[in-house]
A protein has these predicted regions:
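Residues forming the flavin
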Residues: 1-212
Length: 212
């Protein structure tokens, strides 16, 4: 061990990506797990695919289960990788590091968006999905006066009174965790009380969604 980062789950998963290493781990588990009903180990197997998980489960003689580790999450990275591949197979283009900075809303529709890495390009589409997350991913922001959605300045579910944003006890359910953009039954967002017909919201940016 040269540094603490070597013990991160993602680093361990890279080491355990080889069948030889997984076989060694399985053999050692089998030697000490004779009198147990099941084996539980950290989720540090299968960064890129499910194959490594299936490989070690087939070789451990007891039911093998995985529990989550501290971030980064190996299963989470795997799911993200698979979703990106599936998205690409459907014809999607993933622009790593690019951020939507704004757009043009006219006549109740989002006409195009502008991005940080393509400042001179307008990205047009018939429909758009807003999935920017909550406060931790900057999908929502706040200042001393209000909670707001920073890209299109959409309507949000937060009250104007700042004193209502938090509970006095840190152990209570915090109201701000439920804030998000206001949508209708079709998940279409609203701005100044008017529905944007081709802009939909999904995930933690939705009002009522508690990301915690």
């Amino acid at each position: 061990r040269q540094s603490p980062s070597e013990m991160r789950s993602s680093n361990l998963a890279k080491v355990l990506a080889r069948d030889k290493k997984l076989q060694q781990i399985a053999s050692r588990i089998n030697k000490v797990a004779n009198d147990v009903e099941a084996v539980v180990m950290p989720a540090i197997v299968g960064m890129d695919s499910q194959e490594a998980v299936s490989f070690i489960r087939d070789r451990v003689q007891k039911p093998l289960h995985f529990i989550a580790t501290m971030p980064p999450s190996v299963p989470g990275v795997r799911v993200q990788t698979l979703l990106r591949k599936y998205f690409a197979n459907l014809g999607g283009v993933y622009m790593l590091g690019n951020r939507v900075t704004g757009g043009c809303i006219e006549d109740g529709r989002l006409r195009y968006v502008e991005t940080s890495l393509l400042p001179d390009e307008r990205l047009e589409a018939s429909d758009f999905v807003l999935a920017t997350g909550s406060f931790t991913s900057d999908g929502l922001k706040s200042n001393y006066e209000c909670v707001y959605e920073p890209i299109f300045h959409l309507d949000v579910t937060a009250p104007a009174d700042r004193m209502q944003w938090v509970s006095t006890s840190v152990f209570d359910d915090q109201p701000y965790l439920h804030y998000g953009v206001r949508v209708n039954a079709l998940q279409q967002v609203q701005k100044e009380g008017h529905t944007i017909s081709n802009l939909y919201a999904a995930g933690a940016v939705l009002g009522g969604h508690n990301a915690a």
